[in-house]
């Protein structure tokens, strides 16, 4: 269970990272805060590109990449923040989260409200993420 204090810290961190977003195409700035072991919180933001051959990066993706590159692979919760709407993890972020902890809490927040999703699998926006042991070679 995440305390209200931790949730507030995650939302504030994600909100601060949203200020750094590069989103000239969608206009939707998203920030992320990733709670890792030892209560370390790392952040990220979305980075868009106009080149169809080059991928854009979701805020969750950049936070996860930061965590892994800094040696944190025990992830406990992810918060995504956007000013006016609730933004859920994209398919790539969901896959990364499943690789490291498919049972982590997801917090989606905006300036008016927030929602805590108890388990990554509770988000049915995309087909199920490929988890450990699910790669059948098909």
What is the predicted function of each stretch?
Residues 26-36:
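Short beta-strand scaffold segments in enzyme catalytic cores
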Residues 1-20, 70-138:
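C-terminal binding/interaction regions
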Residues 35, 54, 95:
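Short, electropositive, low-hydrophobicity segments enriched in small/polar residues
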Residues 40-41:
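Hydrophobic "anchor" residues
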Residues 58, 62-70:
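Feature captures the catalytic cores and cofactor-binding loops of soluble hydro-lyases/lyases
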Residues 45-61:
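Compact, glycine-rich, soluble single-domain proteins
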